[in-house]
């Protein structure tokens, strides 16, 4: 599905049911394949159908508002054929009443909707610490989801009883009403009011789940976080979504990761960035200093004559490549050279002597350039 469902129908996110229906009627009339012969009309019509199917039902609309399309992926499909209109039939009868002979009677007979259905996919947003994202590991999470009722094994019926075929629709889940007009005959197909489209009626409902066949439960599970994930990474945990209906397979759980910022380290792809400060003498003479990395403390060699803001590299100390943790990026360290604003009299004399020795005491860009106004402090 391309685009936001509200944008597809051209309505605001807080629109009412009547406004939603008007927008749907207008667009469905415009893009119905029997009316609009443009190459993209059929695909557009499917998008409009899918958007209205989700937003017209309060329960699926609430899930969509909260989780996006992942939250309603089990509710129908974008490519559903036109023969299974269900509750759309009354709208289409109105939309196309002006087109002679065209109506829902042109579609196939009502198709039973009471078979096994896949459970909905679920979304979980999970925050990770900086190092958790780099090295991965196991994470325990808790998810509320629908599980098959253990009391009735998902049938919805009280123990020792079973569901009966609906006498109103004879198990089809739909009822049809024929209407004759000067423009032709129309058949209005709608969801059976007795069984709610299930095709079956439960006389004695399971006391545990109230006849739904599923119960809301909170489940604890451990998931594996691969090394090298980043904010925006999506993990799929198979079969950990809502339980299916009437023996259908469960949906999947999609975990969206967000990585917390770190006080010392930043990330650029598979490289880690940080900064250290050294004295001007360390920059001039060189040194070996201890630096923090995600692996712990490491030795970093400061070459003599290091220039301010020079970037030194610790190879292989960066982020593992996602899917290939043996391959790692580098740790790039920007070295800040700290120039003192005040020095002791002895230090100043020594620096003057050094400047005279180099013949650069008053020349720009020499020691005086490096040390700023150090020689002129009183």
Swiss-Prot record:
Q: Which SMART domains match?
A: DnaJ (SM00271)
The segment(s) forming the J domain are 4-68
Q: Where in the cell is it found?
A: Cytoplasm
Q: Where are the zinc fingers (CR-type)?
A: 136-218
Annotated disulfide bonds: none
Record-listed Zn(2+) 1 binding positions: 149, 152, 206, 209
Positions contributing to Zn(2+) 2 binding: 166, 169, 192, 195
Q: Which PROSITE patterns match?
A: DNAJ_2, ZF_CR
One GO term describing the cellular component: cytoplasm
Keyword Nucleotide-binding set for record: no
Q: What does this protein do?
A: Participates actively in the response to hyperosmotic and heat shock by preventing the aggregation of stress-denatured proteins and by disaggregating proteins, also in an autonomous, DnaK-independent fashion. Unfolded proteins bind initially to DnaJ; upon interaction with the DnaJ-bound protein, DnaK hydrolyzes its bound ATP, resulting in the formation of a stable complex. GrpE releases ADP from DnaK; ATP binding to DnaK triggers the release of the substrate protein, thus completing the reaction cycle.
The UniProt entry's sequence similarity note says: Belongs to the DnaJ family.
Q: Which PANTHER family match?
A: CHAPERONE PROTEIN DNAJ A6, CHLOROPLASTIC, DNAJ HOMOLOG 1, MITOCHONDRIAL-RELATED
Q: How does it assemble?
A: Homodimer.
Q: What is this protein called?
A: Chaperone protein DnaJ
**Which gene is the coding source of this polypeptide chain?**
dnaJ
